Amino acid sequence: MENDKGQLVELYVPRKCSATNRIIKAKDHSSVQINIAQVDEEGRAIPGEYVTYALSGYIRARGEADDSLNRLAQQDGLLKNVWSYSR
């Protein structure tokens, strides 16, 4: 779809699950998007700087959302030394 200026504008941009890389469908009403703010040395949120994770309803229904979020946050350097039974 194009707007009046001739620029390509999409009405729906599909998201991917951060944990499984599956496309989150438009009818997946149990999926969530979580934004975690970056903080400065004093512990205050930096405006406009955050890390976004999208979790599909499939992951949430299996009870894997908390483990997936911990794993993703560790990979991005937001968490360290989180216990996991798989280690």
Swiss-Prot record:
InterPro entries found in the cross-reference section: Ribosomal_eS21, Ribosomal_eS21_CS, Ribosomal_eS21_sf
GO MF term (any one): structural constituent of ribosome
Gene3D superfamilies: 3.30.1230.20
Keywords (A to Z) from UniProt: Cytoplasm, Ribonucleoprotein, Ribosomal protein, rRNA processing
GO-annotated biological processes: rRNA processing; translation
Domain of life of the source: Eukaryota
Cellular compartment(s): Cytoplasm
GO-annotated cellular components: cytoplasm; ribonucleoprotein complex; ribosome
UniProt cross-references to Pfam families, sorted A to Z: Ribosomal_S21e (PF01249)
Major place of residence: cytoplasm
Protein role: Required for the processing of the 20S rRNA-precursor to mature 18S rRNA in a late step of the maturation of 40S ribosomal subunits. Has a physiological role leading to 18S rRNA stability.
Subunit note: Component of the small ribosomal subunit. Mature ribosomes consist of a small (40S) and a large (60S) subunit. The 40S subunit contains about 33 different proteins and 1 molecule of RNA (18S). The 60S subunit contains about 49 different proteins and 3 molecules of RNA (25S, 5.8S and 5S).
Assigned protein family: Belongs to the eukaryotic ribosomal protein eS21 family.
Protein name: Small ribosomal subunit protein eS21
Source organism: Kluyveromyces lactis (strain ATCC 8585 / CBS 2359 / DSM 70799 / NBRC 1267 / NRRL Y-1140 / WM37) (Yeast)
